[in-house]
């Protein structure tokens, strides 16, 4: 959840910095402020609001694959494939996933960004509407799908079952899901029935896109 004060600060800043109206307010400012509200509502982290995929410093093949996905967004929505961005830290997985969501917002699709921990906390909480909502949103990004958040076998199986239920529903309804993980094989994170289901659905509904190259953050470059 993005703090309200931060949202209002960013909207005010964009108006003040507007070269068209020089802070007075214009259609361009209003449009961008609406866009900021939409990114915030989707849960896209502020750090990625103003970053463009064209300026991505990571590995070229990964970058070009994401640009191709964005340029063919309507076709990707039609296919409804689950896209798994896998690779070590600092390779631009979250950057890429958020770039897809920002384009989806502009194309009038419903979107949401969440981490696996927040997702599980919400869908296992007292509000059952959240589970239904996450199954109906057009484009969903699930970040930080990693084993380190599930220290025991029981927690791995429990959370795996919750995620499997959501993914199966979205796959069957051809709704795109983008998952980001530091693990090269997401199916191994949860094991059990999730692993079997993930492997069974993989050939038809899942695409693995490796994010390789160097850790850009260590070189103080912007992802």
Identify the residue ranges that each predicted region occupies:
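A short, basic N-terminal segment
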Residues: 1-68, 205, 213-223
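Short glycine-rich substrate-engagement loop in P-loop NTPases that contacts/grips substrate
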Residues: 63-70, 101-137, 149, 153-157
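Short, surface-exposed polybasic-and-hydrophobic patches located at secondary-structure transitions
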Residues: 66-80
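Walker A/P-loop nucleotide-binding motif
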Residues: 78-97
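Short loop/turn elements that form and flank the Walker-type P-loop nucleotide-binding site
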Residues: 78-79, 134-137, 170-174
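Residue-level preference for the first positions of well-ordered beta-strands
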Residues: 80-84, 139, 176-178
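Walker B catalytic acidic pair
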Residues: 143-145
């Amino acid at each position: 959840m993005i703090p309200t004060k931060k949202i209002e600060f960013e909207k005010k800043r964009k108006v003040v910095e507007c070269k068209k109206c020089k802070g007075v307010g214009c259609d361009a400012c209003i449009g961008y402020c609406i866009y900021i509200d939409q990114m915030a509502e989707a849960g896209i982290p502020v750090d990625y609001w103003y970053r463009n995929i064209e300026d991505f410093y990571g590995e070229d093949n990964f970058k070009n694959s994401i640009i191709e996905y964005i340029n063919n967004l309507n076709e990707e929505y039609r296919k409804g494939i689950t896209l798994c961005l896998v690779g070590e830290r600092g390779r631009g997985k979250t950057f890429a996933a958020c770039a897809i969501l920002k384009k989806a917002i502009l194309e009038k699709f419903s979107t949401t960004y969440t981490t696996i921990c927040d997702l599980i906390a919400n869908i296992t909480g007292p509000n059952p509407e959240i589970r239904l909502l996450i199954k109906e949103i057009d484009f969903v990004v699930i970040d930080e799908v990693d084993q380190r958040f599930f220290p025991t076998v029981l927690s791995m199986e429990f959370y795996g079952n919750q995620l499997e239920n959501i993914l199966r529903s979205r796959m069957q309804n051809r709704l795109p899901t983008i998952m980001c993980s530091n693990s090269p094989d997401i199916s191994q994170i949860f094991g059990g029935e999730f692993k079997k289901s993930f492997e069974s659905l993989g050939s038809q509904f899942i695409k693995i896109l490796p994010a390789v190259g160097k850790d850009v953050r260590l070189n103080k470059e912007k992802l």
